[in-house]
Amino acid sequence: KRGVERLLVEEGASVLRMFLAEGMADTVRRAVNPQLTLGPERGGAQFRFEVPEGAACRRENLGGMEVATCTLRPDTRDEDLRYLTQAVAEGLRCVPSRTSYCVGAVVALPDGRSFTGYTHETSPTHHAEQEAIRKALDAGAELRGAAIYSSMEPCSQRKSEPESCTQLILRHGFARVVFALYEPDRFVRCRGAQTLREAGVDVRVYPELAEGVRRANAHLGR
């Protein structure tokens, strides 16, 4: 659930292929000793690993090793942090409640428009994602392929309304979901990130912004 930032695999082509097949890798760095010759007993397909077609690769020589660093997905870190910081700030506008988290959200469209929302902004049963999505729809926005930034992991089940935020996000066809803090199991067991990933949504987590989310929810304790 928490994810792996870096993973070192030695002679593990099958492991690398597994991560690539699941779409779980952003960057692959491959180091090969050009002086090393494998015998027939070690030259089977399980030891071969090819970088996916279309990957942007940078090659260099380090200490006699041929190193290729290949980017499999575009680097969206700066944009993600900008929108996610805005979402965290939106969460601070929420009126604290003993029965819900204070969360902020931003819907970012490919055309550059964005829409914000925070928990209970217009209704005592609305979550932040609902508020931001409603504003986007009211403006006539097409949400398929858009990104949504939430200070906390989108809920996967809830008691106040029949549709969870995860279901709402999937129904509207969002391509990316970015958040700072996994939802604690205080009210329900949240499996939003897992459900979204299994549905093919690109999910990114930036825990370096999680402290701001904790501050917004200090009324609930740690």
Regions found by a protein language model. Give the residues of each.
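Anionic group-transfer/hydrolysis microenvironments
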Residues: 12, 106, 118
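Residues that mark the start of a beta-strand
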Residues: 4-6, 102, 147
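Zn2+-dependent cytidine deaminase-like catalytic core
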Residues: 17-22, 27-30, 34-44, 109, ...
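Short, basic and Ser/Thr-rich N-terminal targeting/leader segments
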Residues: 99-103, 126
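Short beta-strand segments
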Residues: 10, 104, 151
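Short beta-strand scaffold segments in enzyme catalytic cores
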Residues: 68, 102-111
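Enzymes that bind and transform nitrogen-containing heteroaromatic metabolites
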Residues: 1-85, 89-94, 98, 136
